């Protein structure tokens, strides 16, 4: 028999499959159920991870990968175009109201560009962010409630806050607002950058002020490499431009950086030691080996039932290589039928079970990972 006769092998494989439909249906169901098991498991696990991350982001105050703190304008312009940066966002903190009714609330006044506002959960659901050269401001419903202002575009309000120890009262026109999220640590009153400069001029404060942070340029970034090695990427960006973040006393090239600890990848990179790595690797191998054994046993039973058939084929001259091809074709056909069904059903099962599992966990945002 010609080993290269693949057409004959495929035809024999299909006829063999059609001759044992009931057994093949059981095999397809076994493959599908195994796929359902692992798909649902990973869907739930990834969804819980995403939920933890979302909860952490709200505590941190944003979901950018990391950032560079208290920059001068020159440093900001140097760093923002680094090839490791996918997107950047600018924030300039101006001050905070400290008197009643804000004495028990954390409210920050400052400028944030659209990227930064988005990463800080400050996307207006009504209206928009303030435009340059205006007296506009955008904030959340909690701040408006404390001010006694009904959310309405064009509403005017005054806000008294401290700028580096200097008290100032400023009038604003409401141009947008978003819903207050009690999980987010700070509320924000966003104003144009032109208004930042006007407030600084009025109060006589020059960045970085006496506190070392007022109206400095803070740049948060999303990295092209993702969240796997945030700290290393931030250090490399600084090195590209002759800066470092290790020691303030090493020279005037020090720049402070921050890593968003809300990302589980960032936490793992900082806390990953050999025992943890071995435990994760062992768990992954155990899960993979379990799936392999389940599906292998299904095919082993199927092949065992056909052992007489394969013996007859060998008697008439079929080579071991051809027999392996026949079995591979059958395995591929059964897998192509069972795995897609299992993936679809597993995702649906995982999606239904995820909210139930997350409901038992405190402080986790309900998210279903696709």
Model-derived features: positions:
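N-terminal Sec/SRP start-transfer signal
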Residues: 1-39, 49, 328
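Alpha-helical transmembrane segments of multi-pass membrane proteins
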Residues: 14-22, 321-342, 346, 350
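Small-residue faces within membrane-embedded alpha-helices
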Residues: 32-39, 43, 284, 291, ...
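Small-residue-rich transmembrane alpha-helices
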Residues: 46, 296-301, 308, 332-366, ...
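Basic-flanked hydrophobic alpha-helices used for secretion and membrane insertion
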Residues: 46-267
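Interfacial "coupling" helices/loops that link adjacent transmembrane helices in transporter permeases
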Residues: 290-334
């Amino acid at each position: 028999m010609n080993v290269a006769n693949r057409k004959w092998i495929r035809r024999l494989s299909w006829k063999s499959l059609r001759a044992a439909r009931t057994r093949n249906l059981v095999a397809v169901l076994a493959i599908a159920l195994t796929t359902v098991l692992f798909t649902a498991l990973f869907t739930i696990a990834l969804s819980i991870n995403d939920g933890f991350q979302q909860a952490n982001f709200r505590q941190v105050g944003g979901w950018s990968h990391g950032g560079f703190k208290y920059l001068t304008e020159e440093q900001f312009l140097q760093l923002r175009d680094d090839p490791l940066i996918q997107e950047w966002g600018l924030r300039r903190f101006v001050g905070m109201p400290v008197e009643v009714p804000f004495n028990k609330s954390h409210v920050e006044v400052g400028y944030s560009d659209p990227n930064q506002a988005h990463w800080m959960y400050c996307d207006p659901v009504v209206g928009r962010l303030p435009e340059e050269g205006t007296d506009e401001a955008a904030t959340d419903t909690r701040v408006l409630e404390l001010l006694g202002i009904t959310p309405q575009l064009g509403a005017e309000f005054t806000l008294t806050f401290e700028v580096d120890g200097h008290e100032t009262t400023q009038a604003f026109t409401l141009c947008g607002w978003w819903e207050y999220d009690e999980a987010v640590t700070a509320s924000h009153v966003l104003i144009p950058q032109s208004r930042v400069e006007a407030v600084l001029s009025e109060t006589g404060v020059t960045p970085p002020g006496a506190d070392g942070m007022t109206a400095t340029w803070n740049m948060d970034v999303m990295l092209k490499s993702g969240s796997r090695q945030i700290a290393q990427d931030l250090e490399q960006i600084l090195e590209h431009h002759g800066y470092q973040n290790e020691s303030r006393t090493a020279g005037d090239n020090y720049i402070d950086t921050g890593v968003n600890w809300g990302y589980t990848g960032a936490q793992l990179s900082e806390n990953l030691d050999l025992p943890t790595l071995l435990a994760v690797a062992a768990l992954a191998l155990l899960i993979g080996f379990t799936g392999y054994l389940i599906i292998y046993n299904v095919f082993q039973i199927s092949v065992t039932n056909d052992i007489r058939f394969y013996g007859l084929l060998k008697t008439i001259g079929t080579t071991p290589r051809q027999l392996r091809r026949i079995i591979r074709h059958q395995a591929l056909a059964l897998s192509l039928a069972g795995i897609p069904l299992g993936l679809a059903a597993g995702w649906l099962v995982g999606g239904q079970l995820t909210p139930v599992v997350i409901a038992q966990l405190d402080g986790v945002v309900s998210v279903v990972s696709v």
